[in-house]
Structures are given as C-alpha cells and as structure tokens.
Amino acid sequence: MFHATTIVAVKKGEQVAMAGDGQVTMGQATVMKHKARKVRRLFHGKVLAGFAGSVADAFTLFEKFENKLEEYQGNLQRAAVELAKDWRMDKALRNLEALLIVADKQSMLLISGSGEVIEPDDGIAAIGSGGNYALAAARALVKNTDLQPAQLVQEAMEVASSICVYTNDQIIVEEL
C-alpha cells in the first residue's frame, strides 16, 4: 500500500472528475508538503491522471504515459496497455512504486506496475492509503445522491481525509 496519498475518480456518462489530496509524507511520521498536485491534465487537457506512490516515480510515469498518449493519438486504452507492458518488462521501470488512475470522457483505467490495466465496472476508482475510504464514500454518494462527479469526488476525499492520517484536506479536483 502507498502512504501519503489518496486519489479518487468518478465517471458518469461523459463527465469525469478526479481528486487528490495534497499531503506528501516523508517516512512514516513527517509531513513535508501540504499542497502537492497529484492530479494532472494530460494530452491537451483531454485526459486526467492521478498517482499514488513515490513522487519521483509518478513524474516518470506521467511523462511515459503522456508519450504513449501522443504515440497512439490520445487512445487512452491503447496508451495504458502499452505503458503497463513497458512498466512490467523494463528493468528500470519495474522498480517504480506507484499506481495511476487515468480517465478521459470515454473510459477510466487503473494502471499498476505489475502490468494490470483495470477498468472499474461502476465508473469509480480510488488508490492510495485513503483509497478504500474514498471508494466506499464515492459509491455510497453515487448510489444515494444526484451529485455531479466533481462534487462526488470532493465529498469522497473529505471523508477519506477525516479518517486516513496520510490524507489531508487540501483537495484538488479536475474534471472533463
């Protein structure tokens, strides 16, 4: 499990939103930064990507993923599969410790270093130390409210930040 991060994403129809907290923790006990940006727009603003794990590793993966998006003309699924293949096969990449959630208006995917590319059945994904709390909150909110994706991820992150010590309430939301 990756500490110091929570990312949650919700897709409803062609609307998608992703949120991440801002906390960066060094080791197990020291908060080094409160307002880190862990959710980004890629490929001319058409793709959202969020990471959990080592910051340096995540920047490497963002760059590799954006290169794959360019190579495959924005085809999210193809770019994700190719990144996962490289991540699994390349000796240097294999040592990177991170998870990614990527989304565009058509799909949302979770990408892991073990080569997994998973599309959630319900259009909801969460990763990181507070991921399970955010996932549970998002699912409950989707089922019981009419909130839009941006509001859903904001609320889910607030729940996670109130429970997980590695997740703060400095939440950044991006939406398509």
Swiss-Prot record:
Keywords: Allosteric enzyme, Cytoplasm, Hydrolase, Metal-binding, Protease, Sodium, Threonine protease
One GO process term, biological-process aspect: proteolysis involved in protein catabolic process
Cystine connections: none
GO CC entries: HslUV protease complex; proteasome core complex
Residues spanning the membrane: none
Regulation of its function: Allosterically activated by HslU binding.
Annotated Gene3D superfamilies: Glutamine Phosphoribosylpyrophosphate, subunit 1, domain 1
Keyword tRNA processing attributed: no
Enzyme Commission number(s) of this protein: 3.4.25.2
Localization of this protein: Cytoplasm
Catalytic activity of the protein: ATP-dependent cleavage of peptide bonds with broad specificity
UniProt: Na(+) binding residues: S161, C164, T167
One annotated GO molecular function: threonine-type endopeptidase activity
Top-rank taxon: Bacteria
Residues at the catalytic site: T5
Family: Belongs to the peptidase T1B family. HslV subfamily.
Function: Protease subunit of a proteasome-like degradation complex believed to be a general protein degrading machinery.
Subunit composition and interactions: A double ring-shaped homohexamer of HslV is capped on each side by a ring-shaped HslU homohexamer. The assembly of the HslU/HslV complex is dependent on binding of ATP.
NCBIfam families the UniProt entry points to: ATP_dep_HslV, PRK05456.1
Name used for this protein in its record: ATP-dependent protease subunit HslV
Source organism per UniProt: Desulfitobacterium hafniense (strain Y51)
